[in-house]
Design a protein with these regions (language model features):
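Non-catalytic cap/lid and distal C-terminal segments of serine-dependent acyl enzymes
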Residues: 24-295
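Bacterial N-terminal signal peptides that target proteins for export
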Residues: 1-10
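Sec-dependent N-terminal signal peptides
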Residues: 9-17
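C-terminal motif of bacterial Sec signal peptides marking the signal peptidase cleavage site
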Residues: 20-22
Length: 295
């Protein structure tokens, strides 16, 4: 008899989650003030371009060194923000702009709450195609960005860390290096939980039903198990030891090692915040510069 009552309860919980989700959207606070931290010898611009994949205009922030020689092309690092953030976050909450002084273009796209994937139930929300096709084409058309895999890298925090690793595994021909900082790598494989029903509903819209093909196609663990170690971008992973995301990061680091996929993993002190992420930047960029093609 108890089992007969489960379905109505789940339906009720889903209904409540939908109502709460609608209320949340109406009560969304305005974005925080934009106060980018710029280095002395860099130039910053905010760009809006039309994404064919999303069929709407999307913004991105770009930071370049000021002393670019004529006709010179520079490598590009795409920086993905976390959930609840926006394309200003990297330049507002870190001093990442200083790395552009080393002959590097930094591109920070708007990712909304997409996990940088093509949504399962919304054909118009093709965020993977927006990043991997539209954004890169716009950057390489309008800025001195060197084309080709040896000149491209991708890095992200939290949701953006998931996006960076997922995109690198799905498109090994696009990137030479990918870094995931405090990455939410296990989101597609998390089972249903009443305690997180609203989050599960959001994720189901992005990744599809539990154990669906779409969900498996965007699961970094599934992708890592089938990846070609000779073609996979170099993967840099780090995670704070006080984070709930640490176990999943440890697990995928072990999987990458077992599969002989070039990678490194650096757990360290800290929680899921910019204090910890900023402490990891020097090490992450040292690894990045060791793999990018720079002339």
């Amino acid at each position: 008899m108890k089992s007969e009552n489960i379905l109505p309860c789940v339906v009720l919980c889903l209904s409540v989650a939908l109502v709460l989700g609608a209320c949340e959207k109406k009560a969304t606070p305005p974005p925080p003030p934009d106060h980018p931290r710029l280095a002395p010898n860099v130039l910053m611009r905010d760009i809006t371009f039309h994404s064919a994949a999303l069929n709407r205009n999307m913004p991105y922030r770009i930071i370049l060194p000021t002393n670019i020689a004529a006709e010179k092309k520079l490598p590009v690092l795409y920086l993905l923000h976390g959930g609840g953030g926006n394309f200003h976050d990297w330049s507002n909450y870190s001093d990442v702009a200083r790395f552009a002084e080393n002959g590097l273009i930094l591109v920070m796209p708007e990712g909304e709450s997409s996990y940088y994937t093509n949504a399962a139930d919304r054909p118009q929300d093709r965020y993977e195609d927006y990043i991997a096709t539209d954004l890169m084409a716009d950057v390489e058309q309008h800025f001195p960005a060197a084309p080709g895999r040896p000149n491209r890298a991708i890095m992200g925090i939290s949701m953006g860390g998931f996006g960076a690793v997922n995109l690198a595994l799905k498109h090994p021909d696009l990137f030479i290096f990918a870094a995931g900082i405090s990455s939410a790598l296990d989101v597609p494989s998390r089972p249903f939980s009443i305690k997180r029903i609203q989050q599960y509903h959001q994720h189901a819209g992005i990744f599809g039903p539990w154990k669906s093909e779409h969900r498996r196609a965007n699961d970094p663990f599934v992708l890592a198990r089938s990846a070609d170690p000779t073609r996979t971008p170099y993967l840099y992973l780090t995670c704070g030891e006080q984070e709930g995301l640490l176990p999943a990061n440890r697990q995928i680091a072990a999987l990458l090692k077992d599969r002989h996929i070039p990678s490194e993993f650096h757990p360290g002190p800290g929680a899921h915040d910019w204090n910890q992420w900023n402490r990891r930047l020097d090490d992450a960029f040292q690894s990045l510069f060791a793999h990018l093609q720079r002339k």
